[in-house]
Amino acid sequence: MAQRVAVNDGAAGSKRTSRVRVAVRLRPYMDKQDEKSEGSCVRGLGPQKLEIINWRNATETLQYQFDVFHGEETTQQEVFLTSVKPILPHILNGQNASVFAYGPTGAGKTHTMLGSQEQPGVIPRAVKEVFNLVGAQKKEQDGWEYSIGMSYLEIYNEKVLDLLSPGSQDLPIREDKDRNILIPGLTHTPLSSFADFDTHFIPASLNRTTASTKLNQRSSRSHAILLIKVVKSQRGPPHRQQTGKLYLVDLAGSEDNRRTGNQGIRLKESGAINLSLFTLSKVVDALNTGAGGRVPYRDSKLTRLLQDSLGGSAHSVMITNIAPEYKYYFDTFSALNFAAKSKQIVNRPFVRETVLAPTIAPGKRTREEQEAGGSGEPQNKRSKEGKKAEHSPSPPLHPQSSPDSSVLDRLLALEKMMMGSAERERLNLLKTVAQSRKEIQMLKEKQKELEDKANMFNKQKETTEKESKDALLFKTDLPPLHRKQSTAAKPRKQQAVVTPLQVSQVQPLQQCAVVCKPSQTLVKKKRVQTEVCDGKENIGVDLPPVEDVNWESRLDPALLEQSRKKILQTLNSGSLKELKSLQQIGDKKAKLIMGWREINGDFTQVEDLKKIEGVTVKRFSSFIKANILSSMGK
């Protein structure tokens, strides 16, 4: 069973605290970024102090003091040695460490964290140092095993994406019972050497979302977080296991969209970046305020993942990158104020250690122990004697004496009983199997009988259908109508009855437009009884079922042409009222038709209606269908 071991601060007995260390790095002055040649607005005053011009009063300056100030000429190695390297040994002792770069866009955050091949940044130097520390501890402490792994993700538009698995979707953020933040489904890649890390990290970095803006040719459009996990396991008892994590975070820079010229997707990305950084500032303000108030970690996925770094249990270092040019003045001013508030945050790191407690199963007591247990001595007395016996030299081992005859008799009886029960179970099982086989055979015979009946029925059905088809070859017209005398004793009142289509008087239009095709699958006749409108006679008609007759609607070309001429005549000579009487022609369309006639003359064909504004091909087709059917109904 694994249990969590809290580590206290030596003799004091209270948890250690670790303040967030803040380092400020000033990017070198760039002429092309200073369009007005105004010079630098920031100046260093020492290894920890700097000053910036007060925008409210140009004759004054504002001074800031941090843990470390890196000037324009500071190298990548100096930044790593002074700010990052001191916290790395903590992860080999089961604690967490965090390094993140903060600042406006174009201030050099990605250069500080990644660097280049000639000047590696914080990430490659830190990972290499972790492998060096593990190698050194392996030589000093022989009873421990070490395993190193990495995970790499980005937060793009408030979506957590796995950079080691580019095809992954938005990953959820969870919290376990110990309040540790974790991401289910995030790829964890074991590492054996720094070269192995290089193989995985470089392609994954290319998967990160970047784009060009007016202020930065290669602007990061997402926050990137690299997690290095070191697990230290003890080979022998008590089999302790310590887990340390190193978070290396490259934040995207805050942007002023009026200067970057962001539009479309760039504008959406900028909004997500600024919102997450604003939530980060709210978290810092809440931590500085204290008083047990709510800290809005859950308001953003970035602050949710940085929860351990700010006010959590990690040794944290924030590298604030600033730009010296005047056009970045307010971005630099805001970044310095944020850094000044962040250095007041206090974390409480502890060792994450699990101890595998050995689980010893209670063994059977020997006969001598049972006899000793039956003597009525208290349990604590026996345990004291057992402790004394541990310190005394153990007696020599004696060969075990032969068991008593009564014990042998009991064992033989038990064996016979067990063998007998097994034989009975075997016989019962065989009987059950035989019965099941018999039932299966009966079911098979019954199934065969049912199949024979089904085949016979299908043959009879096929014969009947064939005879029906042969009969239809000589009979295609409907049977004549037969009159039947009314059986009513008294004349009933006249009532409205809907006359079926088969017996109603066929109109001339229906004679030319509707054709009945008798179905060839006619099986039986159905007698249909209906009533004439006067309610005095019943007419019996032997007709095929309606579902067995296929009706097909077909328009006579002459009738269709007649309808189109009638519509064309209305379009050319109709008044406003007559035009509105056409289907799908309202007041507006009627006025447009009359205006078109005055300008272009009469319509030569109905298709000319498509030339009028607002009459599309689809509307014209619907217009033709509706008016042709309407004219037929008349």
UniProtKB/Swiss-Prot annotation:
GO molecular function: ATP binding; ATP hydrolysis activity; DNA binding; microtubule binding; microtubule motor activity
Name under which the protein is recorded: Kinesin-like protein KIF22
Disordered: region residues: 357-406
Domain of life: Eukaryota
InterPro entries: Kinesin-like_fam, Kinesin_motor_CS, Kinesin_motor_dom, Kinesin_motor_dom_sf, P-loop_NTPase, RuvA_2-like
Gene that this polypeptide is encoded by: kif22
Record GO cellular component, one term: microtubule
Post-translational modifications: Ubiquitinated, leading to its subsequent proteasomal degradation.
Family: Belongs to the TRAFAC class myosin-kinesin ATPase superfamily. Kinesin family.
Organism: Danio rerio (Zebrafish)
